[in-house]
């Protein structure tokens, strides 16, 4: 009888080496006021992280905003994120994979603790970088910039600064710009072609504020640098946000000197009124004008333009 063979232990299957997929690269996003040093610090750190770990980070998304746009962005984020963001006071927001990390200090601390990236650049260097960046940022727009210094009952409340889309509406922008400087002197009928000392004569709640009647300030007159009126140049700029600057008219091709600033998106003005600029600084000034008490849309306090002119030339 054959002897029974002892049971041999079953051989172990070869170890299975599972190759895990690589982690997706992180997305860094920096949104901030273009002329703040904290924005420049955050921008530099984000770019340094990408350079130091090219496969761990996507190219950072850098979003420079002018003051008015930054204030609008910050308000939207406060409503969206709530919590501690209600008291957020920095001029920059840093995001990792679309989640708020914090301000420049938070990004700097995270870069050092997690990635061993230490920023030792002096603050004086960042101030110089900020100035250079801001100058180039404005120059690259190829737009003109003007200001209106505002008073309520003769008390100064601040400055409104507008970006003029001279590439889209060159003739309309030139009219507004020259009326800000007063360099055209007087019209044939003796009107001083200057916004200085003119008033805001109308405030439409949730609509717009209106000024620029340089004749008598009643709101029924005005004059352009080209004559009493000039044509509608085009309707390419939409009324899609707060702070849009446009020309008042009495019908097609009747633009003069009167203008309006929207208080919210006003698509019903599209294709009827020529928008040609955007408020970029003066959030608190526009808010104060908006809150002036009125009677039949006429301000009960004197809202005047103490001075006006051109910036960044």
UniProtKB/Swiss-Prot annotation:
Cleaved signal peptide residues: none
SUPFAM superfamilies per the UniProt record, alphabetical: Cyclophilin-like (SSF50891)
Residue ranges of domain PPIase cyclophilin-type in the record: 147-310
An example molecular function term from Gene Ontology annotations: peptidyl-prolyl cis-trans isomerase activity
InterPro entries according to UniProt: Cyclophilin-like_dom_sf (IPR029000), Cyclophilin-type_PPIase_dom (IPR002130)
One Pfam assignment: Pro_isomerase
Role of this protein: Probable inactive PPIase with no peptidyl-prolyl cis-trans isomerase activity.
Family: Belongs to the cyclophilin-type PPIase family.
Matches recorded under PANTHER family: PEPTIDYL-PROLYL CIS-TRANS ISOMERASE, PEPTIDYL-PROLYL CIS-TRANS ISOMERASE D-RELATED
Identification of the protein by name: Probable inactive peptidyl-prolyl cis-trans isomerase-like 6
């Amino acid at each position: 009888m054959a002897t029974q063979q002892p049971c041999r232990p079953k051989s172990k299957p070869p170890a299975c080496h599972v190759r895990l997929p690589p982690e997706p690269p992180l997305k860094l996003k920096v949104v901030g006021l273009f002329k703040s040093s904290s924005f420049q610090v955050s921008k530099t750190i984000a770019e340094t992280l990408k350079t130091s770990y090219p496969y761990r980070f996507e190219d950072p998304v850098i979003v420079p905003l002018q003051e008015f746009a930054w204030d609008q962005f910050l308000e939207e984020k406060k409503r969206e994120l709530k919590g501690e963001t209600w008291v957020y006071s920095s001029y920059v927001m840093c995001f990792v994979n679309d989640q708020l990390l914090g301000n420049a200090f938070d990004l700097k601390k995270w870069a050092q603790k997690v990635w061993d990236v230490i920023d030792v650049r002096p603050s004086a260097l960042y101030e110089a970088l900020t100035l250079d960046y801001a100058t180039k940022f404005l120059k690259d727009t190829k737009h003109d910039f003007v200001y209106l210094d505002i008073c309520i009952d003769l008390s100064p409340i601040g400055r409104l600064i507008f970006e003029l889309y001279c590439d889209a509406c060159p003739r309309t922008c030139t009219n507004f710009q020259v009326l800000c400087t007063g360099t055209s002197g007087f019209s044939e009928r003796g009107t001083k072609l200057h916004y200085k000392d003119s008033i805001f004569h109308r405030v439409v709640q949730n609509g717009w504020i209106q000024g620029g009647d340089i004749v008598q300030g009643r709101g029924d007159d005005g004059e352009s640098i080209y004559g009493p009126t000039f044509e509608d140049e085009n309707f390419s700029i939409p009324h899609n946000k707060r702070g849009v600057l446009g020309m008042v008219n009495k019908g097609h091709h009747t633009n003069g000197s009167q203008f309006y600033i929207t208080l919210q998106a006003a698509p019903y003005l599209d294709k009827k009124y020529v928008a040609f600029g955007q408020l970029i600084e003066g959030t608190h000034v526009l808010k104060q004008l908006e809150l002036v008490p009125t009677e039949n849309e006429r301000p009960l306090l004197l809202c005047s333009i103490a001075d006006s002119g051109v910036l960044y030339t």
